[in-house]
Amino acid sequence: MSQRAPIVTIDGPSGAGKGTISQILASRLGWKLLDSGAIYRVLALAAIHHNVELDNEASLALLAAHLDVQFITANGNGIKVVLEGEDVSHAIRSQECSNAASKVAAFPRVREALLRRQRAFAEAPGLIADGRDMGTVVFPTSPAKLYLTASAEERAQRRYNQLQDKGFDVNIDRLLAEVVERDERDMNRPVAPLVPAEDALVIDTTGIGIDEVVELALSHIKEKLPDLVL
């Protein structure tokens, strides 16, 4: 697979800090940003809207092939996600959508249908690709790969805080159970399991600040892409 622009992949489980770090790096470098998890959330939401069963692989793959989705970068304000002309940035962050996204992502035909869309985001001047298999499947030849992780307890707490801030009514114990269940499902699925790429820098974000993680990431990027001016 040829690459038209430099790519930095950032993989890891939910709540490890991928989204925050990816947005900071994209802003710092002036690069495009791909939130791969959002694509699966959008597909899950589209399935719900169109009454497609989450265990119907064929129908989900067909829906994915014709998915009308746009990602609009808003400087300093994250990413605006648009599905069929509607801003769904808030809707796709619900816990229901999060769990549904993990389920639809387990189907090989669904992943294949969305693979081309993800790779199309690789454009100049560069791309920060945030996901779960960016470095292992989608952009395996990228020289700069990161894998962020954190304890299940800390990731559940981060998710709890995030959902509370957005006005969702959530239970921390239930969230922790869902984090553990999702980890088990994602790490043991037969297609594109959640594992670090062999050449990825693994960063455990438990108990460390955002600035420190960003500096570790930038140092790795500079090492792997020495021609970049950071």
From Swiss-Prot:
InterPro entries: Cytidylate_kin (IPR003136), Cytidylate_kinase_dom (IPR011994), P-loop_NTPase (IPR027417). It comes from the Bacteria. It is found in: Cytoplasm. GO terms for molecular function: ATP binding; CMP kinase activity; dCMP kinase activity. GO terms for cellular component: cytosol. ATP binds at G12, P13, S14, G15, A16, G17, K18, G19, T20. Belongs to the cytidylate kinase family. Type 1 subfamily. PANTHER family: CYTIDYLATE KINASE, CYTIDYLATE KINASE/PANTOATE-BETA-ALANINE LIGASE. This is Cytidylate kinase. It comes from Shewanella loihica (strain ATCC BAA-1088 / PV-4).
